[in-house]
Amino acid sequence: MNWLYDLLPLPGTTVLVALGALALGITAGVVGSLAVLQQRSLVGDAIAHAALPGIAVAFIVSGARDSATLTIGAVIAAAVAAALILRLQRTPRLRADAAIGVVLAGAFSVGVVLLTWITGSGRGDQAGLESYLFGQASGIVESDVTLSFILMAIALIAVIVLTRILRAVTFDRTFSAAAGLPVRFAEAASAALLVIAVVVGLRMVGAILMVVMLIAPAVAARQFVTRLSPMLALSGLIGAVVGVSGALASSAAGVPTGPVIALIGTATAVLAVLLAPHRGVAWTARHRMRARSRLRRTELLLALDHAQPAAPRVPDAVAGDMGRSVRWVRRGLGSLQRAGLAVVANDAVTLTEAGRREAQRAREAVLAWSAWIEHGWRLGLPDAREPDPLNLAGSLGDEMAARLARMAREDPAHAAVR
């Protein structure tokens, strides 16, 4: 690893921390995606907390504080906790969240008691055990990084080999069981992957903050992709970026690495939820505002064009006919004016020629949507739940939209509307 120290213009400790964070980010990102999709993300939190008593018992039994011994203890305790959670979740009268809570609280309590007893024993070699609570990345050595990359490789290979089974169980457990797939094996494999991710992250972010690395990259990736394989890849990439950037930022600021990584991961997930295209809160709010504006404009066009499109109408009268407030109507009229569809003069509104053509198109689109509702089942169409009836061609294609329009024109029930 000396060549890497020479290649990067960073202190050796910073390089080690960044590499450890890289392995953690990739492992937690990929494994956490499966946990989030399976609604088992808190199982990872419980396993992380359950690793503490294993570390404490390993130290008490061996009397040594070397990483290998403590890692073995963490693996055993985490595996026992995972098996216990799976067993309790199959108990008919015990909810899944209750099983997780029992294991998490019980194991963490035992871990805190043992760590407190070890600290009060006065043994000189017990210093640093409490770092497994919040992580102490500055204390990792090359052997820790090597172990992290080995565990990362094992986790990635397992995910690749078991992708088909994991995908089926993740999205439809009942169907998978009916199809004869090894559902319990898949659940055990998912729990084992969580154990691996937790062991990789204990030294970096600690037992308490480990859940952030399992959830945040997966939540962020979920906002951008809809398929499992791209989500696993993107989540691993996001986790790697979060881990490395957190390690470098904490080194530059001289603050603990674990909390910084957790903060960056949380910020990344929040920003993705807010700003992601098509799914983000901001994009959805903007889309709904535009949809409401289009709907208001369409309602006004149809109302103004219903009787005498060329005759001026007073906004107050239009509001009364529509059952809307005058303020609502005037806001819509402003939109029509800006689009060149209406003219307001002396507090009277008149549709322009373009406005009358637009009203006619809107009326035909609404009639076609009505035809979809009434006759769509004959054409093998899905339920008419299209949020924008003015853009049926975008959902059904030009040919099918034109066919619905013809059916609407030929339907005598719509003659009065036309």
Region roles according to the model:
Residues 309-418:
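Structured cytosolic domains appended to multi-pass membrane proteins
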Residues 1-25:
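Membrane-interfacial amphipathic/re-entrant helices at transmembrane-helix boundaries
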Residues 18-23, 71-76, 98-102, 145-150, ...:
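Hydrophobic alpha-helical transmembrane segments
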Residues 3, 104-159:
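Transmembrane helix-bundle core of multi-pass membrane transporters
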Residues 26, 30, 49-50, 105, ...:
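Hydrophobic alpha-helical segments embedded in the membrane of multi-pass proteins
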Residues 33-122, 221-235, 248-260:
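Short loop segments and helix-boundary regions at transmembrane helix junctions
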